[in-house]
A protein has these predicted regions:
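Conserved AMP-binding
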Residues: 1, 51, 104
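AMP-dependent adenylate-forming
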Residues: 42-46, 61-116
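Alpha-helix capping/helix-boundary segments
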Residues: 1-2, 28, 107
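Activation segment
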Residues: 5-6, 32, 93, 111
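Short beta-turn/strand-loop junction motif enriched in small, turn-promoting residues
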Residues: 2, 10, 87-90
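Gly/Ser/Thr-rich phosphate-binding loop
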Residues: 6-68, 81
């Protein structure tokens, strides 16, 4: 939607009054970030969240001339914990690959109707 917002407002001053912009559910590519920064200097919040949780379990805040962090999903949102675990559900050391697990009140307890 950030892409659509920027495209719809191209060549206008419609976005000039924005103080904060939140986007999530899409990859913040270097090109999209550059388009945003070339148009606005406002604070940009980029959120990450898996479908099993919510639109945002973590976020990155880009203020002023902050550079885009290529591989970061940011810090956990309040009341949320994020863990990288191995196949045996044990935490892995920093820099070691694993599966991302989220915990906290934003996480659903399961499906209303479990998939078949």
């Amino acid at each position: 939607m950030l892409d659509v917002l920027l495209e719809m407002a191209r060549g206008t001053t419609k976005l000039d009054g924005l103080g904060h912009v939140w986007c999530g559910g899409e990859v913040l590519t270097p090109e999209l970030f550059e388009r945003f920064r070339s148009r606005l200097t406002t604070t940009l919040y980029h959120g990450y969240g898996p479908a099993e949780a919510t639109i945002g379990v973590s976020h990155v805040i880009y203020r002023d001339n902050a550079e885009r962090i290529a591989t970061s999903i940011g810090r956990p949102n309040p009341s949320t914990q994020l863990y990288v675990l191995d196949d045996d559900l044990r935490p892995v050391p920093v820099g070691v690959g694993g599966e991302l697990y989220a915990a906290g009140f934003l996480l659903g307890r399961g499906y209303v109707t479990p998939p078949v």
